[in-house]
């Protein structure tokens, strides 16, 4: 058993179905087919620990008022040997279930037994999943969108790993195409300017300080060696140097941010291997392309897109769409991923339907591709929005953010809201060492527990075997609420993995910290009666395990002292 909440839900389903069949046998209910029993956590505590609207779902089939069905089912239930303490019928026909103390005791035993593996579930059954995220243009430093995408993608990968998937983290290097051409022309202009030659950064080129820095470094290494060579040769050397340095810098910054990739995949490699041209040929052979205005178009409207798009420009150069289709075919066919997840900025939403359509055209199930779209980031300081601009060079970079607030706060804050919600990142709040700062609040809970453990160990209090601890003594409301929240950790992992919702873990860990602080502010651990002290010791050890495991998923430090 890895998910005790799931076990309780299964018991409820079983009890409900047996009661339903018993009621039919006795002629109290009449129906032909049975709907699925959905068991959910109610929003209000007074509505029990778990609930089902099954009676409402069955009302039409049974030709009876849902409340009456619920009452009949409840009257026929046999809950002995289960985690169910009592059953109540509420409202128009909800059946609410309250869990017994055995559920609480088994939860704590399970956490102590599984330790650092508590929360892991086997949802994925070892399936190969790839999470591709950040994939920033290697033409300059990483910005706030990349910072948010990094936090979302990396935590998502950790959640999927916890959920039993075989996960690969990937960075797609956009080292081919139009922006690389502009990058080359921008570097060339700066290099020539440094040599005293009149040159201008082209329209739509890169004007940032980083471009000047790269040109200066190149000049220091090569001097005026490239002054009089043909422009194409000069740009090729500058691009090669600039990309190498920028990618090295990206890797350094991402490691500081807690992100290490399994694969760095080059777009250019898809051209070198011929995969881009092969996929264009395949789509053409299957009848999914046509020529218009000298260009080759992909019939995307066949797959639900609003309009067709160009695969090969009239000058014979493939578009970004063509290389991206080849890239996704490489993920599914060449490398055999069962599931591919891309974390993209919301401005790429128009690219989702074409990509899924292209997969369908290639005979790949488009449901194996998921795209998490994330909204924009606003940085707030002193109540004012801090503006940022990539092209003017006055941009706040990922490294600036890490230096300003630290890795922990950055990763935590970016995962506090769902990816599809815009985020206002309060720099002042992220630096506060107070309970107003959610990351401090959670870390303080962990440090506080470590402090209590040290004090208890100094007194000689220890738990040799959890079976010898009288966990039935934990009956106070704050204790019960806390244990029930701990029970939900594997369920949170399951839901977060199914719905690609990394913010669930951040919210969950805040809830655990809040319930722990409430418990500790109301009840003594040290100084309680001996058996109760041991039971509470077992409880706070379980809280520490869950906080540490959840913070590890977020790659946020769990400090032992603060």
From Swiss-Prot:
Its main location: cytoplasm. GO terms for molecular function: arginine-tRNA ligase activity; ATP binding. It comes from the Bacteria. It is found in: Cytoplasm. One of its GO terms (biological process) is arginyl-tRNA aminoacylation. It is an enzyme of class 6 (ligase). Keywords: Aminoacyl-tRNA synthetase, ATP-binding, Cytoplasm, Ligase, Nucleotide-binding, Protein biosynthesis. Coiled coil: none annotated. A motif ('HIGH' region) lies at residues 136-146. The keyword ATP-binding applies. GO terms for cellular component: cytoplasm. It catalyses: tRNA(Arg) + L-arginine + ATP = L-arginyl-tRNA(Arg) + AMP + diphosphate. Monomer. This is Arginine--tRNA ligase. It comes from Caldanaerobacter subterraneus subsp. tengcongensis (strain DSM 15242 / JCM 11007 / NBRC 100824 / MB4) (Thermoanaerobacter tengcongensis).
């Amino acid at each position: 058993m890895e998910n005790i909440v799931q076990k309780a839900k299964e018991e409820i389903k079983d009890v409900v179905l047996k009661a339903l069949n018993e009621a039919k046998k006795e002629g109290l209910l009449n129906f032909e087919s049975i709907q699925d029993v959905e068991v959910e956590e109610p929003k209000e505590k007074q509505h029990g620990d778990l609930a089902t609207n099954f009676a409402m779902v069955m009302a039409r089939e049974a030709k009876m008022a849902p409340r009456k069905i619920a009452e009949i089912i409840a009257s026929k239930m046999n809950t002995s040997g289960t985690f169910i303490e009592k059953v109540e019928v509420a409202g128009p026909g909800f059946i609410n279930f309250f869990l017994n103390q055995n559920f609480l005791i088994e939860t704590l035993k399970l956490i102590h037994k599984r330790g650092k593996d508590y929360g892991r579930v086997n949802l994925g059954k070892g399936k190969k999943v790839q999470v591709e995220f950040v994939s920033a243009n290697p033409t300059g430093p990483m910005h706030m969108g990349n910072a948010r995408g990094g936090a979302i993608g990396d935590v998502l990968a950790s959640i999927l790993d916890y959920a039993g998937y075989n996960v690969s983290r990937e960075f797609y290097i956009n080292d081919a195409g139009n922006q690389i051409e502009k990058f080359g022309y921008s570097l060339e202009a700066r290099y020539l300017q440094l040599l005293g030659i009149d040159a201008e950064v082209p329209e739509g080129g890169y004007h940032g300080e980083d471009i000047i820095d790269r040109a200066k470094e190149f000049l220091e290494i090569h001097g005026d060696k490239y002054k009089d060579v043909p422009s194409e040769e000069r740009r090729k050397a500058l691009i090669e140097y600039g990309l190498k340095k920028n990618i090295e810098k990206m890797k350094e910054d991402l490691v500081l941010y807690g992100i290490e990739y399994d694969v760095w995949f080059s777009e250019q490699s898809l051209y070198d291997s011929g995969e881009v041209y092969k996929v264009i040929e395949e789509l053409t052979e299957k009848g999914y392309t046509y020529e218009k205005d000298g260009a080759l178009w992909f019939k995307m409207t066949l797959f639900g897109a609003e309009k067709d798009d160009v695969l090969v420009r009239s000058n014979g150069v493939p578009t970004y769409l063509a290389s991206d289709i080849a890239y996704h075919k490489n993920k599914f066919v060449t490398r055999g991923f069962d599931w591919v997840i891309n974390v993209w900025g919301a401005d790429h939403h128009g690219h989702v339907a074409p990509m899924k359509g292209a997969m369908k055209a290639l005979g790949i199930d488009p449901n194996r591709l998921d795209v998490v779209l994330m909204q924009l980031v606003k940085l707030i300081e002193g109540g004012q929005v801090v503006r940022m601009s990539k092209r003017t060079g006055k941009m706040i970079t990922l490294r600036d953010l890490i230096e300003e607030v630290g890795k922990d706060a950055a990763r935590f804050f970016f995962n506090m809201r769902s990816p599809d919600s815009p985020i206002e990142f309060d720099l002042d709040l992220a630096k506060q060492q107070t309970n107003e700062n959610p990351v401090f609040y959670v870390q303080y809970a962990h440090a506080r527990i470590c402090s209590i453990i040290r004090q208890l160990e100094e007194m000689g209090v220890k738990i040799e075997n959890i079976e010898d601890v009288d966990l039935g003594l934990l009956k106070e409301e704050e204790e019960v609420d806390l244990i029930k929240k701990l029970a939900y950790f594997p369920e949170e992992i399951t839901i977060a993995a199914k719905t690609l919702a990394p913010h669930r873990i951040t919210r969950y860990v805040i809830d655990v910290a809040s319930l722990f602080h409430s418990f500790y502010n109301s009840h003594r651990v040290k100084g309680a009666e001996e058996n109760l002290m041991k039971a509470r010791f077992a409880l706070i050890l379980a809280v520490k395990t869950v906080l540490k495991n959840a913070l590890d998923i977020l790659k946020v430090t769990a400090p032992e002292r603060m």
